[in-house]
């Protein structure tokens, strides 16, 4: 790939498809840590989602080994769940008492940024194709929050005298919980892919990377990414 054997600084731009796996661990309601972190819902325990995001890298090619610094931002994940349950408490003398419980839960998770440093080794099969493997360490910033509201309503339905039933509200209660965290951690990952030299200076890159962002308080976050990009060596 030229008289310098492929050595020199380079820049790379990628478009990545990320599969994101978020595991949020809540303590048991009867456990010793039940008051430290609220048990909100199983719905937020194990989230699998995906996003498409750009990534930019700046590095140096030593003619076999490459080192690079990269930066990426991910899409914010958010979802909500609403459930309602009505339980009959009493039914006698044409009077029926029910308890209505409503749960509204909203969760967001945002990998705000990932700043990484990678070391990659290129296998030169021929003048065009170069498979590669590598390792990556990254400083990640993550924000996640959960809002939960539980509302209970006790009401009486009276059908006395055979007339149209009349509903009376007897009691209302509402409990709200909010949890928000912004965490920064150093995580580790692996990289693999194939580069195809379009010209001595321009390379088409298809890659895969796995990254474990670390244990973010009571949240574990892992990403699998497939990317397509171009690398230009100066």
UniProtKB/Swiss-Prot annotation:
It comes from the Bacteria. Keywords: Cell outer membrane, Membrane, Signal, Transmembrane, Transmembrane beta strand. One of its GO terms (cellular component) is cell outer membrane. The keyword Lipid biosynthesis does not apply. One of its GO terms (molecular function) is porin activity. Residues 1 form the signal peptide. It is found in: Cell outer membrane. Belongs to the opacity porin family. Implicated in a number of adherence functions. OPA proteins are implicated in pathogenesis and are subject to phase variation. This is Opacity protein opA56.
């Amino acid at each position: 790939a030229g008289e310098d054997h492929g050595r020199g600084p380079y820049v790379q731009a990628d478009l990545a498809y990320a599969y994101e796996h978020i595991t949020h661990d809540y303590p048991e309601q009867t456990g010793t840590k039940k008051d430290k972190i609220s048990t909100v819902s199983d719905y937020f325990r194990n989230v699998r989602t995906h996003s498409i995001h750009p990534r930019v890298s700046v590095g140096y090619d030593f003619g076999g080994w490459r080192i690079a610094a990269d930066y990426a931002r991910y899409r914010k994940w958010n979802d909500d769940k609403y459930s309602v349950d009505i339980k009959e408490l009493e039914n006698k003398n044409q009077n029926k008492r029910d308890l209505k419980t409503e749960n509204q839960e909203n969760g967001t998770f945002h990998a705000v940024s990932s700043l990484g440093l990678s070391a990659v080794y290129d296998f030169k099969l021929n003048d065009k194709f170069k498979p590669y493997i590598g390792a990556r360490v990254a400083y990640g910033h993550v924000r996640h929050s959960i809002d939960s509201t539980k509302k209970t309503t006790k009401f009486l339905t009276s059908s006395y005298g055979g007339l149209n039933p009349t509903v009376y509200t007897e009691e209302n209660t509402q409990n709200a919980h909010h949890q928000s965290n912004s965490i920064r951690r150093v995580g580790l990952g692996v990289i693999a892919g194939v580069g195809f030299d379009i010209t001595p200076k321009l390379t088409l890159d298809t890659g895969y990377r796995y990254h474990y962002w670390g244990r973010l308080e009571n949240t574990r976050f892992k990403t699998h990414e497939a990317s397509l990009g171009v690398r230009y060596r100066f």
